[in-house]
Amino acid sequence: YVQKFDAPNFKKFMADGAQAEALIPSFPSKTFPNHYTLVTGLVPGHHGLVDNAFYDRSSNTRYSMSDRSKVEDGYYYSGVPLWQLARQHGVKSASYFWVGSELKDESRRPDYYYLFNDTVAAQTKIAQVVSWLRLPEPERPHLITLYFSSPDHEGHDFGPNSAETRDAVLRADSVLGVLMTEIKSTKLPVNVILVSDHGMYEITVLAETTLFRDELINIKDPSVKYVNGGTQLHVYCSDANKRDSTYRVLKKSERNYTVYRKEEFPARWQYQHDRTGDILIEAHPGFYIRDVSRELFLKNAPLGAKRGVHGYDPEATPDVRGIFYAQGPNIKRGAKVPPFQNIHVYPLVAKILQLPLPPIDGKEEVLIGIYRT
C-alpha cells in the first residue's frame, strides 16, 4: 500500500528507521491469530487462537471474535503476552485495542486498557497515547499497543486496488503523521514499531470463485461440527470412522480447495492443536467458502465486484504478507531485513524493554541486526 498509493508519512517513517521487505503472517493469515502471535511470539498452533472462530472440544464451546464473553475469557489464550511479561517484571503497559488485552484476569491484562469499540476516532486514541506518555514516571507505561482497523475494512469491502482503499491508506498516513508529531512533542525516547497482521488478496465475487459450505459437507449430520472461516473450513468429527468417511467424500470432489487430515497439515504451519479441525478444507487463492446456499448467493451477491480477503497460506500467497517498519533510539536507521515471520517481533520488543524471554517460537537473532544499544 505504501508504495502503491505513495503514502508520504509512511515513507518518511521508513527513511528514518528500519524496515523489512515483508512481515510474513503465521498460518492462517487471519486477524485474531496474528494479532495474538505478534504479542506472544507463538504461532497460532501454540497460543491457541487457531482462527477467528473455532470449536474447543475440551469445553464443548465455540470461540468467535464477535462473542464478547469468549474474547474476554482467559481460558482460550495461552502464552505470555508482552504486557503480562512487563507486569511480571514491574514494567507498566497500556493498550488501546489489541487481541488478548481485555481478559477478565487482571494479572494477564495491561495496566491501562480499553474494551474494543470500532467507532473510536483515531484522534481519540492518539490523544490517549500521548497522555499516557505524559504521566509521571512511576505511572507511565513503557509498552503501548495501539490498533487502527482502517484500511482493513476498505480492503475487504472494495478490494486492495480500489480508490476507497487508496483513500483509507492516505487517511491512515495522515494519522501516522499526527501520531509521530505528538510523540515527538513529549521529548521522550520512544521506539515505534509499525506492523500489520496480514495483507490483502483481491478476489472477484462470482459463483465460480465461491465454494458453498452446504455442497461440501452434510451440515445436518449431528456427528460433524464445522466452523467456517472463509479461506478455511474446520470440520470436527465424532470419531475416526466418521472422519475417514467425510475425508474420502471431500477428497473425491476436491476442486478449487485442498482437503487435509490433521496429520497431513504442512509442517511449516505448526498447526497441530486440539482446536484445529480433524479435517481442514483449505480454499485455493482466489476462492472463498461461504455459508449461504448457492441460490441465495446468486440472488443477493454483488456479482463481478472486487473484494479483499486474507487467511490463505502466506507461503503460497505473497499478497497476504504484511509490513514491518520501526524507528527510535534503539533502532538502526537505514537497516533493511529480508521477509521474516511475525513470531520474531516479540523478542525485539522484549530486548528494547530489557525483559527476559519466556519460552516462545520467535528468535532474538532474526532482528538483532536492526537493534541499536
Question: Where would I find each of the regions flagged by the language model?
Answer:
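Active-site-proximal N-terminal segment of extracellular/periplasmic enzymes that hydrolyze or transfer
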Residues: Y1-A18
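Loop/turn elements at helix/coil->beta-strand transitions in domains of secreted/extracellular proteins
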Residues: D16-A20, Q88-A94, P138-I144, K187-N191, ...
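Short, solvent-exposed turn/loop segments enriched in Gly/Ser/Thr/Pro and often Arg
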Residues: E21-V39, F97-L103, K363-L367
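His/Asp/Glu-rich, glycine-adjacent segments
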Residues: G41-G159, R255
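A long, amphipathic alpha-helix that forms part
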Residues: A122-R134, P151-V192, V349
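Acidic/histidine-rich catalytic neighborhood
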Residues: P189-V190, H198-S238
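Active-site neighborhoods of enzymes that stabilize oxyanions during catalysis
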Residues: Y226-K336, F340-L348
